[in-house]
Design a protein with these regions (language model features):
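N-terminal type II signal-anchor transmembrane helix
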Residues: 2-76, 83
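Alpha-helical membrane-targeting segments
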Residues: 45-58, 121-140, 166, 198, ...
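N-terminal post-signal-peptidase region of extra-cytosolic proteins
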Residues: 53-60, 89-98, 112, 212
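Soluble periplasmic/extracytoplasmic beta-strand elements of cell-envelope proteins
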Residues: 70-76, 86-87, 95-97, 108-111, ...
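Solvent-exposed coil/turn segments that connect beta secondary-structure elements
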Residues: 76-79, 90-93, 101-104, 112-115, ...
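N-terminal periplasmic "start-of-domain" segments of outer-membrane beta-barrel proteins
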Residues: 79-93, 127-134, 366-368
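Flexible, acidic/glycine-enriched loop-and-adjacent beta/alpha segments
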Residues: 97-150, 242-252, 259
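Non-catalytic, structured segments within soluble enzyme domains
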Residues: 144-391
Length: 392
């Protein structure tokens, strides 16, 4: 992970938890297969034992790469301070450290997504078995994923965006690559990313087993707080909004450090189902301004109730938050050189260099992706005060 607020170590208790998690996951793996694909009682024993062996042979190490982050172009002022000209991104994310996130957010995440997070070794057997049985017996499809499992899935999706396209291009011959047009190159990359995404998120037993195995590996290598921080920085909050800092900026015009209890619970409600719970569709009939964002409010209140039950908030804090209406204050993020006003031409000039100079990538596609995902911080020589005076 990019943020290094924590050492990549586990406490003895955490290591023991990881080992227990491996045993628990093996049992859960057998349960998943038994309820999912083995209806005949006579074959249950064989299926269960075979699944445990297969599970324990799955890879248990997950390489965590850099997160996709927006790139910014800055100008300067006469006093030496900087001013943002424009931002560019595929994912609107601002990665932050542990101390930059309000404790309400951390507690709301655990309460809403994984109440036994600090007790298990990466897999919540109770939640996993409940979800598997409910889904297999025809009930509403349920997730049952721990925070570590959700983090793993998000990391795998990020890998798809970062690596699937380049790997697909590498499989082509030199002549095939030379013959590519920008449109065909883009189509190949997009197809590879979508196929990788489908594999990383498909509702399938083998995918779930791999996710569980990797979650245990992550728990062995990182602390609980480190995993939670990684999750809060990588999670999707609807549309192109990723990570708790960008979500706080976008939905409530504040920072992750300054969120209120009600706001924190409202934001963490979104990650459960961004399409259903996001707060930027005021005209929605089910979750809009007219009904007080009813879907988000219901999920928020569930999280608040869980926080109260876990003694993470006082009764007074709970009462105040539960009585607070969900009222988003949307701040649209600036993107593209059109936001640079009179300096747009200079912004375009800088952007053109970043997308054409070979130092920023081997080809046009790579340079474009690096620019939109690489988190560039570009400080230019443009003096805004002199520029404004010249235009006056």
């Amino acid at each position: 992970m990019r943020n290094r607020d924590f050492a990549e170590t586990r406490t003895p208790l955490g290591v023991i938890g990881g080992l227990i998690g491996l045993v628990v996951a093996s049992a859960a793996a057998a349960t998943l297969v038994v309820v999912g694909i083995t209806p005949a009682i006579a074959t249950v024993g064989i299926a269960a034992s075979g699944t445990i062996g297969m599970f324990e042979n799955l890879p248990g190490y997950l390489a965590i790469g850099e997160l996709s982050q927006k790139s910014n172009i800055y100008a300067t002022r006469s006093d030496g301070s900087t001013a943002l000209l424009a931002s560019f991104y595929d994912q609107n994310r601002v990665e932050v450290g542990w101390d930059a996130i309000n404790q309400y957010v951390k507690d709301a995440t655990v309460a809403g997504e994984d109440p036994r997070y600090y007790e298990h070794g990466g897999i919540d057997l109770q939640g996993t078995v409940r979800a598997a049985l409910t889904t297999a017996t025809g009930g509403r499809t349920q997730g049952g994923s721990s925070i570590a499992q959700q983090y793993v899935k998000n990391v795998l999706v990020q890998e798809c965006e970062r690596e699937a396209g380049p790997l697909a291009l590498e499989k082509l011959t030199e002549d095939e690559r030379a013959a590519l047009t920008p449109d065909t190159r883009f189509a190949i990359v997009e197809e590879a990313e979508l196929a990788c995404y489908d594999t990383a998120t498909e509702v399938a037993i083998d995918r779930k087993l791999r996710e569980m195995r990797l979650a245990i590996g992550v728990e062995k290598r990182y602390t609980k707080d480190e995993i939670l921080l990684g999750y809060l920085n990588i999670a999707g909050f609807g549309g192109t909004v990723y990570g708790i800092e960008a979500a706080a900026n976008y939905y409530y015009s504040t920072t992750a450090a300054n969120l209120t209890l009600a706001q924190a619970a409202s934001l963490m409600a979104i990650v459960n189902n961004p399409v259903k719970f996001q707060l930027d569709r005021p005209d929605s009939e089910t979750n809009g301004a007219a009904n007080g964002y009813a879907d988000n409010t219901a999920r928020r209140d569930y999280i608040l109730t869980s926080m109260l039950e876990q003694k993470k908030v006082t009764q007074a804090e709970f009462d105040e938050a539960i009585a607070t209406p969900v009222q988003p204050v949307i701040t649209e993020p600036s993107t593209g050189c059109q936001t640079a006003a009179g300096s747009a031409y200079f912004c375009d000039y800088v952007k053109n260099i970043l997308q054409t100079d070979p130092i920023f990538g081997e080809d046009e596609q790579e340079r474009m992706l690096n620019f939109r995902r690489g988190g560039y911080e570009v400080y230019t020589t443009l003096d805004l005060d002199l520029q404004n005076a010249a235009e006056a």
